[in-house]
Amino acid sequence: MGNTCVGPSSAADRHGFFHSVSLAVLWRPGGRAEPSQPPGYPPRESSHSSVTSSTAPERVTIADSDLSSSTPNKGGNKPKVRRVQSAGLLADSVLKRDSERLKDLYTLGKKLGQGQFGTTYQCVEKATGKVLACKSIAKRKLVSEEDVEDVRREIQIMHHLAGHPSVVSIVGAYEDAVAVHLVMELCAGGELFDRIVQRGHYSEKAAAQLARVIIGVVEACHSLGVMHRDLKPENFLFVNHKEDSPLKTIDFGLSIFFKPGENYSDVVGSPYYVAPEVLMKHYGREVDVWSAGVIIYILLSGVPPFWDESEQGIFEKVLKGDLDFSSDPWPAISDSAKDLVRKMLNRDPRKRLTAHEALCHPWVCVDGVAPDKPLDSAVLTRLKQFSAMNKLKKMALRVIAENLSEDEIAGLREMFKMLDTDNSGQITLEELKTGLRRVGANLKDSEITTLMEAADIDNSGSIDYGEFIAATMHLNKVEREDNLFAAFSYFDKDSSGYITQDELQKACEEFGIGDAHLEDIIKDIDQDNDGRIDYNEFVTMMQKGNNPLGKKGQGQLSFGLREALKLG
């Protein structure tokens, strides 16, 4: 193989078009995820759609109440973190060192994105005028010692991997009274699947170039003792919009340092990309190769290898589902590509390719055997649909919640007041944890965080009254005809009997939702292909996948806020 099986360099990656694809997560009562059927794809047992944004979406933590620490046999006590209860801030330093003031060195600009723990801004270095990104993590949201350790570890890992051409460069970490600020390289070039779709042509050779970047990052992490644990397309961004823009990995929030031979049990990651041994709570670094294999499968076909209409269904497919190499476009894809994917998605981690072996595979290596002929145009269509989330259902649930009578929601209103201990009109993560414990819910912090993320429609970091009602109202209210019609009428501004793209755009603006790829939302729901959503199509969308999963138990890993609060 000579010198062909080496990690990707900026020169080798010039024609890769990396961007991030958002995991398809549809809002459902109780915070469960529901993918929808991608049009134009042969019928399967399940379906999928997703959200695309200018920033990487929140990662999903697949929680389990019986999990042990992510690092086994840690030994010793964690440092005590003193809290100022009145202010909700960490009194001790997160960084454990004196820090220069961020505002003395940088000027903060526009907000680029917001997640559960932090907000990312564009910032400018005063001394040089260089444009960078600043991720500000609110210290009031670091409510446990584990949260603080996670932030410290993320910073350590980013410094540890510094210098790799496909890892975002960290410039510095700063701390003040209210937040920890991570200043890093700005990746403004957009997301993987969007870039592919924009170009309008796509070949196996191009997919192999992208695969080389992904696998190269995995190899670099493993060689430096880092397990990523959350590899997915949305964790890769282009630096700029140029044709030869480098592709960078941007998120190490779930990454850990590992020791060869040790096994880990925290069930973390994102449903479509999680390895089977993670679900079995006994795994090592091989999980990253599995996740990379899933991404490559999607790059070649436009759909994930394992999907279903519920997270539980996805997990069952991951554990025992068959790989589909018979449906289009797989018959036209080279045997070498299928060989790589099959070996990366071997359920036995001992037989799975290592990252280095995958990087040396003939289909991946520089000047390898990947053909340059275009892939089926349907792949581009599916990639586009895979990267657009149906946010309409989330908004519709909120509309229904806000139109319920006082009698219907009286009990939920009192529950909201009970949780909102400071009467701010917002339930914070800490308030949710306290409230759930008061009602006897035996949930781990990671599980409660998952509930929070699902209920927080606008990603503000807290749950307002409308979001709370939407997350906890009973399913029979969602499916009641008068409520469905009222919700439809809210979007149908001109009472034409149809929801148009312009009307959907206005609704997104009212809800504070950014670019939602409206054409793809409509296409996903529009069964008669007239470019509009009629009432029957709207009702079908609202009723699809509403079978409750129930609280997590022996065979279930998903649960909803309604169940957690014991509301039946």
From Swiss-Prot:
Binding site for ATP: 112-120, 135
UniProt-annotated binding residues for Ca(2+) 3: 492, 494, 496, 498, 503
Domain EF-hand positions: 407-442, 443-478, 479-512, 513-548
InterPro entries listed in its UniProt record: CDPK_Ser/Thr_kinases, EF-hand-dom_pair, EF_Hand_1_Ca_BS, EF_hand_dom, Kinase-like_dom_sf, Prot_kinase_dom, Protein_kinase_ATP_BS, Ser/Thr_kinase_AS
Keyword hit for Repeat: yes
SUPFAM superfamilies to which the protein is assigned, alphabetical: EF-hand, Protein kinase-like (PK-like)
Protein name: Calcium-dependent protein kinase 17
Species assigned in the record: Oryza sativa subsp. japonica (Rice)
